[in-house]
Amino acid sequence: MADEVGLFYLMMKKREEEESYIRRRNLTVLRNKKDPFSYEENTFRKFFRFPKSLCWDLINQLKPYDKQQTSIPFELRFISVLYFLCNGSYQCCVGNAYFAVMSQPTISRCIEYICKLVVERKHGEVRFPNSVEEYNRIKTGFYSKFGIKGVIGAIDCTHVGIIAPALSNTVVQHDYMNRKGYYSINVEAVCDDELIFRHVNAKFPGSCHDSGIWTTSPARIKLIRKHSDGALKWLLGDSGYPLEPWLFTPVANPETPNEQNFNTRHIRARNTIERAFGVLKSRFRSISRERTLRYKHSKAAIFIYTCTIFHNILEKRGIFLNETEILPDRSPPENVETISEIHSGEYYTRGRAARQRCINTLNN
């Protein structure tokens, strides 16, 4: 009897080993057969937003820095992360995609690792201008398109939905509840006239007001330093921001034709950031209003930074979305019922004088 039991267990073990081998072989065959780079170019772009050649360039640039301990090829991990960011799928759906075939824990590790690698190696794709020539190029771009001198960017915030954060000693859940009643990160960003992000700050929860985020913003600190050196450059923001020498808001209750003209041009120029958000979220549906990132703040922020890096790479290379593909940004607006001006002491006084000098230079 004991011999029969022993034989039975040996047979079961052998069968399990054979089935395990068949599964591994099938996965290998499936991965080889379903190479996403074999797709037609238009199909590839539909799924991954990048042209194949540019995708290969990124893979070749990042692969030498890959230290993740896994047998899954870097190319497959990278393309799976792109698929997740572009389509906003659940991890299990990404893992079951016919080109991936990975377990949910595996795809989870891949997404976090690859996004961190992209931010670490490619963070320079999102940066403030660092030369006089670059500033002048942006100023010229805004002036030629919208007729306002000295503008180096448009600023606003957008909300990216996340799941309810777990309670802890450092996390207060209601801090993440925004004005529309869902949990989010309030992401501050600055873009130039070509919709390229020059600054992104994803550190603040959804309940934070845009002007509160601006108070400690690295972009603000940089501009304060620039103005102390006598530089004439400013951002354009809506009336939810304070009027400062380096941040122009619309004129409250415009009385003269020049002031009305300024407000009209201001609206058109500032709309570049709204459009940039729309393009970003249309490319990367994982951070769109229709999706919710099921991650804690720190991980979700890494995904947001990765998406803005990829967005800039595409924009700089002239790879644009069609107008019909761009969705409007549906972030909850700030609680500003009428145009008013937020006073901030000396900065407000200096900002009002600087804005008036700018208004006086407008050509009708």
Language model features with spans:
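Short, polybasic Lys/Arg-rich linear motifs in disordered N-terminal/cytosolic regions
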Residues: 1-364
